[in-house]
Amino acid sequence: MSLGFLNLTKLSIGANEIMSTRCPELKSIRKVSDRHLRARLAGLACALFLASLTIHSQNISWPQFRGPDSNPVGTHARLAERWSKTENVEWAQEIPGRGWSSPIVTGGKIYVTTATTEGKSKPPQIGTEYSNEYVAELQKQGLSMDKILERLTERDIELPKEVKLHYALYCLNLKSGKVEWQKEFFTGQPPGGRHRKNSFTSESPVTDGKFIYVYVANLGLWAYDLKGKQVWSTPLEANPIYLDFGTGSSPALIGNLLIIVNDNEKQQYLAAFDKQTGKQVWRTNRDIGEKGQRRSGWATPFVWRHALRTEVVTVGPSEAISYDLGGRELWRMSGMSATTIPMPFAYDGLLYIDGGRGSSMFAVRPGAAGDISLGKDESSNKYVVWSQPRAGTYLPTPVAYEGGVYTLTETGILARFDAKTGKLTYKTRIDPAATAFTTSPWAYNGKLFCLSEEGQTFVIAAGETFKLLHINELDEMAQATPAIVGERLLVRTETKLYSIRNKK
């Protein structure tokens, strides 16, 4: 900022010299003009200073799932590229219970949710192939599909009647990792079951810098101030989720509105709540997905701000739909899979939609209206800039970085597409050891980071050629997407929260 101020000072001096040399007749009013010019320049300097503070505050804040703009890219040059359980670990704090929600950060404090269980709980299971192999084994035994589902439920699903939970919000000091306070916001049976890979607190909280907003789908919304005082709570109706897989769509904030999307087997809706009171402002029912098929969704809504307007983009079973801030539909697009988990996001003027496993990846330009679905033989149209068939992923949300969009499958296949054209630049398995991923990849300092469920982070050079640089080990299951705050990387594993910071 000091350099900018010096430049402004030079500009002021230069203006005085011009006035003296070329406009001698203005000497009589020179002092007045000089004062006005200096005042305007001082005002500009102040504005630039405030802007720099805003940028700085963004660097030390991570207000929601996947960060300020929902595309997790760090900007600090000192962010660590290597770590282990001991190397470049500033601190590691145990978090009781289990939760795959991401940590959020504001005002030098970290906020994270968790749920502890009275009695035994089914442990998480790494990967997805164990279910596929089990189903294949049961099919060989000649079991009917109903019997197979019954066996799967018995093995993999934790039902509400089996557990009593204590849901809690934790506040930790960013610098030390010390727990400053914890608040239990609900005790009792959950509204639905969960798959053993999921948790009962997979929705990440969100903050506006003044309050922390906690959401558990089909259970409720809660608001806390930064000191841990509950400001309001709003109970929500319980609705069934497909096969009791559990929930995971995080809330979004825009202005005074706290927005949630809830696609379940009974009803599907988008709703906005007054963030100051918790009262519902509007609710829009969504009738998406094929009749008689699965109706549940897990994708977090995305607030897309662009030059034409601000809109709320949602992805659900079979369709992506965008709404204005009053809940009115703006446009929709078919072609999504029946199981939708990745979150939409924007990069360099375009919206990117991952349609889910087996579906396409889409790039959409601003200003869309009506049904913008692609025709049978189309790969683009007036609003869809490009699409890539079968480029959609199951669990991780893609990341856009340095001109590329990177997609990561749950089995460890990484692909890079040109962000503007959609051209595939490479597609490869990261490593023979990289076989299970839920966490979304992130990027900084010319590198891409992919955290596996086994706790290994594969560090890859960004660019058009794939190059695995090294592997960082934490040796504990991980499914939560990290937070990037200044020069710190916050990584949540099954039992701990790590602050990774370069010590060199």
Q: Would you name each region that the model predicts?
A:
Residues M1-A39:
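N-terminal secretory signal peptides that target proteins for export/translocation
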Residues G4-S12, L53-S57, T421:
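Prokaryotic Sec-type signal peptides and long signal-anchor helices
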Residues F5-L6, A45-A47, E162:
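N-terminal hydrophobic alpha-helix used for membrane targeting or insertion
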Residues I18-S20, A45, S57:
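N-terminal export/targeting leaders of redox proteins
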Residues V32-L37, A47, Y167, Q268:
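Generic hydrophobic-segment detector
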Residues A42-T54:
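Bacterial N-terminal signal peptides
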Residues I55-K504:
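Noncatalytic, solvent-exposed loop/strand surfaces
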